[in-house]
Amino acid sequence: TTLFRSSLFGIQYPIIQGGMVWCSGWRLASAVSNAGGLGLLGAGSMHPETLREHIRKCRAATDRPFGVNIPLMYPQIEEIMAIVAEEGVKIVFTSAGNPKAWTGWLHERGIIVAHVVSSSRFAVKCEEAGVDAVVAEGFEAGGHNGREETTTFCLIPAVRNATTLPLIAAGGIGTGEGIFAAMVLGAEGVQIGTRFALTDESSASPVFKEYCLSLGEGDTKLLLKKLAPTRLVRNNFRDAVEKAEDSGASAEELRTLLGRGRAKKGIFEGDLEEGELEIGQVSAIVSRQQS
């Protein structure tokens, strides 16, 4: 933990709150940072100017370090990166893309870069790209996942053996015991999504939170593998996806079924039947909403 406290993120505890779409706004990120962890804003569901507003509000609410999570496949990536630099953000977590694309640019502006990977092969690519830390995420995680379907328990030692980069474990971690287990396996810190998505400060719909707190084992499933493998909660939309996949739907047909704004509809607006409900397997052991 010394590494996280002193040289890397300047935080008190080696706990990072995942920058999740529709959950990770300034209220959540600043609360986590104020508590001694690292809060991340989820740029994936924000228009560029919305992100600017959240960065400013987060900075007003905390004097501790915080960062921004940016999926590299974001359509207005240049605008988002420019805003992050203009607003003086010092920590960026990137995912869903090649870390080579932006790491150098971010480093030139004095920004620390961590990249999310789902395999040791990608972790090696991160090291080659010059990132400062790697987040190894097992497929227990909610939302988008890697194609390898490797569990966190198997992924952490594999990544630890493949790279000397500071290693952050993610996927299926939601308790103190889970954090300890990740560190025993070789991680220096953890990134937690689900547990923070279901807090008071999360910007997700109260209806979505309440529903996810009632889930048990087996209530989430990895689907949409022809597009980007995504862990989804059972509902009408997921049933339709499963039916389409079972009948051999093409990537194009699945894209049409997915449409636009499906995750917003589910997570932010609380449409439990037609929305895309993304949450991790660890939701099965989270039963109450906390601050």
Where in this protein do the model-derived segments appear?
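Alpha/beta enzyme core
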Residues: 23-35, 53-63, 74-168, 175-194
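Short catalytic-loop micro-motif centered on adjacent basic/acidic residues
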Residues: 16, 40-42, 67-69, 91-94, ...
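Active-site mouth loops of central-metabolism enzymes
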Residues: 11-23, 44-45, 69-74, 112-117, ...
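Conserved active-site-proximal phosphate/metal-binding subdomains
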Residues: 146-168, 174-290
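Conserved N-terminal beta1-alpha1 strand-loop-helix module at the mouth
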Residues: 6-61, 268
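Catalytic cores of large soluble enzymes that bind and process phosphate-bearing ligands
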Residues: 43, 47-50, 94, 287, ...
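Short, small-residue-biased leader/transition segments that mark boundaries at the very start
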Residues: 1-3
